[in-house]
Structures are given as structure tokens and as C-alpha cells.
């Protein structure tokens, strides 16, 4: 992807974030801005890799706001919840479940930003397997599963909302036949299968505080009459890419992740779309968010939103966020949109961060 001039991006960000004020980000009418803030992230990929991925964004955000922004990757969702709740982080990039638990437990934060992916403010979790015999019919290449008014339906990979493994953006939009340094990427395969078939299987979840990596899938299992603790062998991998790896390497029979986390492996494992088959999906989940401490001045919170929005409008920002979290834009978040997550947690009896 062509990267625009970083200088031009920085200049635009500074103007938008500060409202073209000559005072920069030193202070505002609703309170003095701190000299530095900390932005916490949860690893959806390997922790060390994510730390490297977010650093360019931290540098740009620091320049846009006129204050230092430190990026910190916590070990898991619980670590970020604790960091935000105890004031060790001022901003946090949360999954929807992590946000609702943190807000419920500490109450000293508000949802500021909601991710938008390819025009959608919701997504779903996907069930994956390396065993084609689990499928009701033969897996089909270059397909995906989507929630529709008629229930879960198989669609072409180009028609899926989320960008699927093996799909890339060409000059005319989405296209099949992505190539990486390691070779041509196999388009993702999917099939339909009943969740009742996974009883007794090794299941790779991500984290107990992950919405698509545990909460919604666990609720699905209960609704299917399967105990997510005793009727399967649960494995917590710590990340969405790690869950895909577990299925790919046959360390688990089944795995769950966001749609389509298989893309995170495509540069090293070009056949991941063939070997890891999507066979079911969860109901729709509100996209992840950035929550901000209520101790931050309102003007700073607004400037943060504007700066992130502007950065995503640059080629560099688009590339960084797509590679790290798959975000293509953002919108103002509304807390009530996450009631569906709270209801799912209540159904499972989860009222505080796990771990």
C-alpha cells in the first residue's frame, strides 16, 4: 500500500486535534491536559509483535496532541481492565466484553470510540476446525459464513463483510488471489456444521474475557446443551491468532476467533485458509472500542477522537490499523449498544473480570 508523507499526515493531525490553535495541547478550558498519557492494548496477536505495530501510531498521536502518548501492551484483557481501573492507563483498546466488565467494576471510564470494519459496526466470532469430517457437507473454498435474516448462510468470500483470508483490495475493490512473499494465499474454506459435534473435542478459546473468543461461543455451547467446561477440553491460547495456530498445528480440534483471524497467519502459512475451516459463527457482536478515563479533560478526549479519525484517513494509518486490528474507520461509541454483551455475561454468571 502506498504510504503518504508522514509529515503531511502529522500536520493534518495536529491541525484537527488542536482545532488549529496556536496553544497546541498544553491546556484547555475544561482542565489542564497532562504532560503524558498511557494507551493500553490487549494482544490479538503476539504481544511483542503488537508492541512494534502500535509504536508508529503512538508517535503520530503524540505529535498530534502535543503530549507524550505511551503505548503499553498488557498480557491479557484482565491486565488492561486492571490498568484502566487503577489509573495506570488513561486509554484502553478493549473488546466489548472487556469494556463492559471494566466499566461495571470501576466506573471511572467512558466509551469514546467504536471501531468500524469495512462499513460495519458489528462482527461475529467464527468456529474453526482442521477436520473436514466435522462438516455436514464438503468444505467449499473461497466462501464464508454470515448472519442473515434467514439465519447463518454460506456466502462467497468477496461478499463477506469482514476481509477474508486470501482476499485483498485490488484496483476495483475486493479480489481473490492475494500473494505474499511466501507465495499465493489460499482462499478461506467454510462449511456448515452443528455445534453438537464438538462434544469431547479440544477447543481453543482466546481469553475468558474475550467476547468473540469465549463469551458468545460459550453461551452458544450452553444453548446447544454442551457444558463449556466439562463436555469439552477447553484451551485458552491468549490471543486470536494463537487460537488459529492451535487449530492449524492440530494442538486443538476446534478453535474460536473473530472473523477472519486466519488472515493473521497468511504471510507465514499461505495454506491456512485450506487447513483451517470455518464451520459455524456466533451472533453479531458490537465492534471493539477505545475507552477513556473520565479524569481526562473532555477537550482532550475530543482531540484524541479527532486525531485517531484523521490518522485512519491516511494510507499509513489505514495500513497500521488494518494490520493490527482490522479497523478501517471509527465512530462515536454509544454505551447502550453493549447491552447485548452485558446480557450474555449475565447469562453465564460473569460479573467481574476473570483470571
Predicted regions and their residues:
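A local structural motif
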Residues: 62-73, 88, 160, 164-183, ...
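Short helices/loops that flank or line small-molecule/ion binding pockets
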Residues: 73, 78-92, 101, 105-106, ...
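C-terminal motif of bacterial Sec signal peptides marking the signal peptidase cleavage site
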Residues: 14-19
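An extracytoplasmic/periplasmic, membrane-proximal ligand-sensing/linker region
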Residues: 33-37, 45-56, 292-355
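Bacterial signal peptide processing site
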Residues: 21-24
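A ligand-binding cleft/hinge motif common to bilobed small-molecule-binding domains
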Residues: 96-107, 217-223, 248-249, 253-274
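Short beta-strand->loop
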Residues: 109-120, 231-233, 266-284
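A conserved helix-loop-strand patch within extracytoplasmic ligand-binding domains
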Residues: 115-209, 213, 222-224
Amino acid at each position: 500500500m502506498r504510504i503518504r508523507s508522514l509529515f503531511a499526515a502529522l500536520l493534518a493531525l495536529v491541525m484537527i486535534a488542536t482545532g488549529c490553535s496556536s496553544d497546541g495541547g498544553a491546556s484547555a478550558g475544561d482542565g489542564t491536559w497532562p504532560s503524558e498519557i498511557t494507551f493500553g492494548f490487549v494482544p490479538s496477536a503476539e504481544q511483542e509483535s503488537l508492541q512494534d505495530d502500535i509504536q508508529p501510531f503512538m508517535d503520530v498521536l503524540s505529535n498530534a496532541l502535543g503530549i507524550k502518548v505511551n503505548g503499553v501492551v498488557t498480557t491479557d484483557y484482565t491486565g488492561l481492565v486492571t490498568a484502566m481501573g487503577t489509573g495506570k492507563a488513561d486509554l484502553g483498546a478493549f473488546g466489548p466484553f472487556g469494556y463492559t466488565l471494566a466499566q461495571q467494576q470501576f466506573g471511572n471510564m467512558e466509551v469514546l470510540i467504536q471501531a468500524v470494519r469495512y462499513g460495519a459496526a458489528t462482527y461475529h466470532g467464527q468456529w474453526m476446525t482442521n477436520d473436514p469430517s466435522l462438516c455436514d457437507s464438503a468444505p467449499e473454498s473461497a466462501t464464508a459464513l454470515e448472519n442473515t435474516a434467514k439465519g447463518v448462510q454460506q456466502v462467497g468470500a468477496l461478499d463477506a463483510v469482514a476481509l477474508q483470508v486470501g482476499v485483498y483490495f485490488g484496483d476495483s475493490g475486493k479480489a481473490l488471489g492475494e500473494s505474499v512473499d511466501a507465495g499465493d494465499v489460499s482462499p478461506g474454506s467454510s462449511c456448515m456444521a452443528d455445534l453438537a459435534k464438538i462434544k469431547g473435542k479440544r477447543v481453543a478459546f482466546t481469553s475468558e474475557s474475550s467476547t468473540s473468543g469465549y463469551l458468545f461461543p460459550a453461551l452458544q455451547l450452553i444453548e446447544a446443551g454442551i457444558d463449556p467446561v466439562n463436555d469439552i477440553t477447553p484451551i485458552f491460547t491468549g490471543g486470536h491468532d494463537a487460537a488459529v495456530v492451535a487449530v492449524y498445528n492440530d494442538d486443538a480440534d476446534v478453535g474460536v476467533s473473530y472473523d477472519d483471524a486466519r488472515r493473521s497467519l497468511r504471510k507465514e502459512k499461505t495454506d491456512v485458509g485450506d487447513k483451517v475451516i470455518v464451520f459455524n459463527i456466533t451472533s453479531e457482536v458490537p465492534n471493539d472500542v477505545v475507552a477513556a478515563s473520565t479524569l481526562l479533560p473532555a477537550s482532550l478526549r475530543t482531540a484524541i477522537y479527532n486525531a485517531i479519525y484523521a490518522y485512519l484517513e491516511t494510507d499509513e494509518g489505514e495500513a497500521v490499523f488494518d494490520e493490527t486490528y482490522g479497523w478501517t474507520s471509527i465512530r462515536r461509541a454509544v454505551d447502550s449498544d453493549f447491552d447485548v454483551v452485558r446480557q450474555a455475561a449475565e447469562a453465564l454468571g460473569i460479573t467481574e473480570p476473570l483470571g
